[in-house]
């Protein structure tokens, strides 16, 4: 009997990943969540952070989105998803700079500032 389940990461432009895995860690506003096979059904919101597939050592930077787990299928719908292997120091610095300028914009709502602060801290963590 396999301990694997299906995970899909989908952006508006394309499917980033469709794979079988043993465990996925996702960033949510409730904290980091570990998903294993036969997890209870779940719907939650993504915060900017890192999605990790433990058995494949794959990691993806994601921004906001939704997560649904049902019948051993994990569906991650996100505005942005990038493999950490594809991000370099310069591109991360550019993303941080853009987010910091958006954060300093006085027209941003508190909710938007909250999301941007998560994004900036995650990008800085990746960039170390």
Language-model-derived ranges and their functions:
Residues 6-98:
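Compact, glycine-rich, soluble single-domain proteins
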Residues 85-128:
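Acidic/glycine-rich phosphate/pyrophosphate-binding loops and surrounding catalytic core
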Residues 1-4:
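N-terminal export/targeting signal detector
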């Amino acid at each position: 009997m396999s301990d694997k389940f299906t995970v899909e990461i989908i952006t508006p432009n394309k499917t980033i990943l469709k794979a079988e895995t043993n465990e996925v860690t996702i960033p949510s506003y409730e904290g980091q969540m570990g998903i294993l096979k036969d997890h209870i059904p779940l719907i939650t919101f993504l915060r900017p952070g890192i999605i990790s597939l433990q058995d494949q050592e794959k990691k993806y930077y994601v921004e906001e989105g939704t997560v649904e787990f049902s019948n051993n299928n994990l569906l991650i719908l996100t505005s942005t998803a990038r493999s950490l292997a594809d991000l370099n120091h310069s591109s991360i610095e550019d993303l941080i700079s853009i987010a910091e300028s958006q954060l300093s914009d006085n027209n941003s709502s508190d909710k938007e500032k909250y999301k941007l602060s998560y994004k900036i801290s995650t990008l800085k963590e990746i960039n170390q």
